[in-house]
Amino acid sequence: MSKFVFVTGGVVSSIGKGIVAASLGRLLKSRGYSVSILKLDPYLNVDPGTMSPFQHGEVFVTEDGAETDLDLGHYERFTDTAMTRLNSVTTGSIYQAVINKERRGSYNGGTVQVIPHITREIRERIHRVASNSNADIIITEIGGTVGDIESLPFLEAIREFKNDVNRNDVAYIHVTLLPYIKTSGEIKTKPTQHSVKELRSIGIQPDLLVCRSDKSINEGLKKKLSGFCGVNINSVIEALDADSIYSVPLSLKKEGLCKETLKYLELEDKECDLKNWEKLVHNLRNPGTPIKVALVGKYIELGDAYLSVVEALRHACIEQKALLDLHWVSAEMIEKDSAETYLNEVDAIVVPGGFGNRGVNGKISAIKFARENKIPFLGLCLGMQCAVIEWARNVANLPDASSSELDPKTPNPVIHLLPEQEDVVDLGGTMRLGVYPCRLTNNTIGKKLYDEDVIYERHRHRYEFNNYYKQSFLNSGYKISGTSPDGRLVELIELDNHPYFLACQYHPEFLSRPGKPHPLFKGLIKSSQENLTQSN
């Protein structure tokens, strides 16, 4: 029988609920409890798959092919547990399910309303995660801020939820902000008091308060919050701004978040083993030589658009005892100027995924610069497609080569639409999504890095390498180091006579973990370090 923890947020958005939920998951797992975490998002989109990266940040893809909120990436990285499509719920998906049931006559002619039908569907989704995961504890993060109209059905649903189970099977955590007023030199509790008041008016009494602040909270403030918010003083948890998200579990452990949560759930506070995590944070805080990595992207104005890529680079640098010196490079600026202007001093180049024409020629120029100047390079998804186009144009004597996505009339579509995508009309959830196997080729860098015959990686794309050109690429020196088991789809490519030049059609960043960096990212950083050693 699962226990349930609900995490809400107050005062401001982007308060860090996802990191708190993920950190609690890490702390519970370190005590031997199994955990699954789900996100309730209050927007009307069915999923974030068709949303602009500028609006929503990256789309995180689960093993079973769900396009989800980036917080699921935090959940997976912190708990080292794979989530599924059940772990991502939006208002759009809830309404879609309820309306479909109404059309099928599932409500026997009744009037369909927010209460009880929408809230019941939300509760059923939470129960479904519990039954499918068999986890000891289900943590649910409610997106948005208490007081938002959009969040009301979710808050009502989690209020009702305590009637589905025993009261000691549920704990409510409210993450809030304690602003520091510089002119008066005071930390203010009033916004938190009002946020809790709003939550109580819905019928939810928080059991724990996690108080975000950039100043330490003294005992007097904790007593004040305890009195006004009806929370035990030991359950007022200080969450100071951290130097890294990976240090948050350690600070919340020190504050007693996990211990207090287990008390409300009437579960044993088992011995906590965070030795590996402490080592990770130590290495993060005590890095070695800086590695200048250029991330050449289309959406660099919003760093969250490439969140998993950045974290994968960070994991690799921690493992290799290097300092990640990340350089954000606009692909469009390279088009206006030159690759040399922005990339001349970097130690490694990463070209991540994306969609559409904008900035593609800048990415291609960056890849050419990496190839010709022997700079370690890693291409991801569109990054691989751009690497293929660059080679075709500049080495394989196909100067008019392109992708049929970028130029439908190109005479040499070295990248083309997957055959199964040709009749697809809807955009949402229709790409090649989720985990697929890839067979690695012997005597390749890819095979050496993975040390496996078959790997499983997550995908999110419609376009692939055009096998019509495979032989001409092989003849001109390209190496295909990974394909689908039937050999039909090219998944991983590389070059000889280069320190490190690999590109993959999949998204390895989704499988990188703190303490377990992905082989392709680890290889990139290691190669960069070797280059630096040789040049010195």
From Swiss-Prot:
Residue numbers binding CTP: 13, 148-150, 188-193, 224
One Pfam family hit: GATase
Functional pathway: Pyrimidine metabolism; CTP biosynthesis via de novo pathway; CTP from UDP: step 2/2
Protein's UniProt keywords contain Transmembrane helix: no
Span list, region Amidoligase domain: 1-267
Protein keywords: ATP-binding, Glutamine amidotransferase, Ligase, Magnesium, Metal-binding, Nucleotide-binding, Pyrimidine biosynthesis
Disulphide bonds in the chain: none
Regulation: Allosterically activated by GTP, when glutamine is the substrate; GTP has no effect on the reaction when ammonia is the substrate. The allosteric effector GTP functions by stabilizing the protein conformation that binds the tetrahedral intermediate(s) formed during glutamine hydrolysis. Inhibited by the product CTP, via allosteric rather than competitive inhibition.
Residues that bind UTP: 13, 188-193, 224
Residues engaged in binding ATP: 14-19, 71
Glutamine amidotransferase type-1 domain span: 292-534
Record's catalysed reaction(s): UTP + L-glutamine + ATP + H2O = CTP + L-glutamate + ADP + phosphate + 2 H(+); L-glutamine + H2O = L-glutamate + NH4(+); UTP + NH4(+) + ATP = CTP + ADP + phosphate + 2 H(+)
Record GO terms (molecular function): ATP binding; CTP synthase activity; glutaminase activity; identical protein binding; metal ion binding
Superkingdom of the organism of origin: Bacteria
Binding positions (L-glutamine): 354, 382-385, 405, 462
Location of the active site: 381, 507, 509
EC numbers for this chain: 6.3.4.2
Position of the signal peptide: none
GO cellular component assignments: cytosol
Residues involved in Mg(2+) binding: 71, 141
Transmembrane annotation, as ranges: none
Miscellaneous note of the record: CTPSs have evolved a hybrid strategy for distinguishing between UTP and CTP. The overlapping regions of the product feedback inhibitory and substrate sites recognize a common feature in both compounds, the triphosphate moiety. To differentiate isosteric substrate and product pyrimidine rings, an additional pocket far from the expected kinase/ligase catalytic site, specifically recognizes the cytosine and ribose portions of the product inhibitor.
Function, in words: Catalyzes the ATP-dependent amination of UTP to CTP with either L-glutamine or ammonia as the source of nitrogen. Regulates intracellular CTP levels through interactions with the four ribonucleotide triphosphates.
HAMAP family linked: PyrG (MF_01227)
Family according to the record: Belongs to the CTP synthase family.
Protein name, per record: CTP synthase
Species the sequence originates in: Prochlorococcus marinus (strain MIT 9312)
